Amino acid sequence: MIRAKHISNLSSTARSFFLNGSRTSVTDGNSCVYSDDENCVSKRQQLRKEAGQTEKRPSSILPKPSVVGCILPGEVTKPVVPKKVDDFGRPSLLPQHVSSSPALPLKSHSVNYASTVVREEVEGKASSEPIGDQIFKAGIVAVNFLSDLSNCKIPSYDGGSDAFGLPKSCMVDPTRPISSVKSSNVKAIRREHFAKIYPRSAAKESSVGTTRNPSSNFRGAKEAERTGFVKGFRQVSNSVVGKSLPTTNNTYGKRTSVLQRPHIDSNRFVPSGFSNSSVEMMKGPSGTALTSRQYCNSGHIVENVSSVLRRFRWGPAAEEALQNLGLRIDAYQANQVLKQMNDYGNALGFFYWLKRQPGFKHDGHTYTTMVGNLGRAKQFGAINKLLDEMVRDGCQPNTVTYNRLIHSYGRANYLNEAMNVFNQMQEAGCKPDRVTYCTLIDIHAKAGFLDIAMDMYQRMQAGGLSPDTFTYSVIINCLGKAGHLPAAHKLFCEMVDQGCTPNLVTYNIMMDLHAKARNYQNALKLYRDMQNAGFEPDKVTYSIVMEVLGHCGYLEEAEAVFTEMQQKNWIPDEPVYGLLVDLWGKAGNVEKAWQWYQAMLHAGLRPNVPTCNSLLSTFLRVNKIAEAYELLQNMLALGLRPSLQTYTLLLSCCTDGRSKLDMGFCGQLMASTGHPAHMFLLKMPAAGPDGENVRNHANNFLDLMHSEDRESKRGLVDAVVDFLHKSGQKEEAGSVWEVAAQKNVFPDALREKSCSYWLINLHVMSEGTAVTALSRTLAWFRKQMLASGTCPSRIDIVTGWGRRSRVTGTSMVRQAVEELLNIFGSPFFTESGNSGCFVGSGEPLNRWLLQSHVERMHLL
């Protein structure tokens, strides 16, 4: 699945919204959605730029589809011979130092295309002075200029002076428009101006087209014929390699090298008296423009202070080290230091230390940055105290401050508090901006409240804020994730018609939505449209394509995409390796999943929890309990804290245990995680006469898990209810389900399509959960009919293929639901051509719902 970490560069509220899969959590790092923040550039992307100054990093993995188990060709680097799964031990799971491999040779046919961007135009006659004399004079002027700089004598130039006395022919004519120079959001150079730079080698072509391994679970009959999707992908892939811009080892000028959010003019949102940070950066404490030496000193101070705060935890030692620096810090420098701090305790200590320094006074920027730091740590009590101090110091919160508060409450799933801040900012006279509305739209859509999200979209337009590319991307993702893909696609087309150009993030969102809906041809078409629009794939794009190929059964082609990604100078990170571990694991190929995990370690990467979860799921799927235990122990040894998904995997394995021994072993694994969910199950009380004690117990636990993302909570509740149902605790299962439904953990489980026309959606549930959910929902209908006399005109029960369906064409959920409905003689039937949907309507449905046994169906 696509994971949140793949696109963390834009925003944790608005850009990371399309990577929330079942293997990741939504919580991530710093947010940069605010109007006065700098553009976000990830650390990984900065490393890519630094790597560009040296030779290319060797490919750590070049898969050969025809040979299972050999994933590193000898001519590139030393082959990695992974241990068999049965033989691995704890040390092999830990990251080890791997010696660097020989660098790949530089491409000899790299193209210098600088002349195509800026052309020198000589007007009049060229200088008759010998070129040697010109160079000599220019050198003398340069030496004098550098001497002035060293003595802090900054020369000033008027419009007609030439700093170095260079001939005018070497400059671009300022009166002439330069068509080849465009903004960063527009493709600067047409592809057809260049020859093919990276022709696909014969070896690579043969690797993609090699006969597939018959042992793969995805092959079978599909091996005899290839769909148009794979052929189309090869065609697009070749066109990418053939038509891409020249890429050298020291050039990273590609459009997608650094992804940044759309620029928002912060001046529009800053009230009088609250200086803009971009303007303040060039001014000293007195408001005068900084000289060159002052500006350099400012950066020097920020670096020195940050270095001290990185070395010490806040305390007397840190204070003494700061005093020994003997530096005078102003509010701007303090703000820059606070932005670099991740530990809220250190940041808060430094903040109050500054407040005690003679002559120092915090401004609105430092207060706002500190609010953001506390918000990431969910320290809302400290935030309220800080806001009171901010007002007492004469700094009124502005739009950016309120946006940070809304984002902080939203990422912690405190939606009511976020809306309260939204109302308070308007009462205080701060007008919401696009960031405000987009944040509210995103957090409500992620929590399953699509109606509120769309209402905020309407309010944004009514407030005179027309949607831009950023806004459209948020809304499109919200609609798609809520199951309204046609509406999302319609909005995408509307966006283009309105002259709002989609960016790479928008294309990635649309491709991901179509891929999740198994519309692989549409995903491929969007991939082609994206390239025709001048965008090159980034790591997120490549991951989506790999996932699409993997789910279609073409895992070797997915590995070929991995190789192509490396050739385009994208360095694979943990989520990319984790995706391939996950794809091979779901295919049932434990050996290949293990090989990719080992390849990640040999690439010098440290495993993360989602990747370990993928490998853990692989072991559990084939009943390798001992290997799963070893992996879990190594996770703990690495300091990786098992997540909610980790516990969910173990609980599902325990539910499906083939023997009491397996179930006991899984129970030990669950206990070793130390997750609060285990104590929740151990302390589950026996249901009382009305089940209120179980509901209170479940309610307290879900409150504890409040800040977890909805997908993780949904997965755990599904596993818990399924476990309780299959272990005979059906009354408890029903009570837990009712609490989860009240807390909107399953927002799509029950929906009114139109007046008195209801839809019960069970297709994302396990069979035990589906039976419990259906029984309690039908009992709710009966209760409503008896209380108000309102009767449903039609009820559709959608089972689909079901969460636990292993083989195409069969659904355990459908079978369990059909059996339950038949036992109680229900009037539900399946319409022709749609065996996954049971329909009940009219008077027969109402008479059946009023029967007393409907109230106790879940106890069967």
From Swiss-Prot:
It comes from the Eukaryota. InterPro entries: Pentatricopeptide_rpt (IPR002885), Smr_dom (IPR002625), Smr_dom_sf (IPR036063), TPR-like_helical_dom_sf (IPR011990). Gene3D superfamilies: 3.30.1370.110, Tetratricopeptide repeat domain. PPR repeats lie at residues 363-397, 398-432, 433-467, 468-502, 503-537, 538-572, 573-607, 608-642. Residues 760-843 form the Smr domain. Pfam families: PPR, PPR_1, PPR_2. Keywords: Repeat. Belongs to the PPR family. P subfamily. This is Pentatricopeptide repeat-containing protein At1g18900. It comes from Arabidopsis thaliana (Mouse-ear cress).
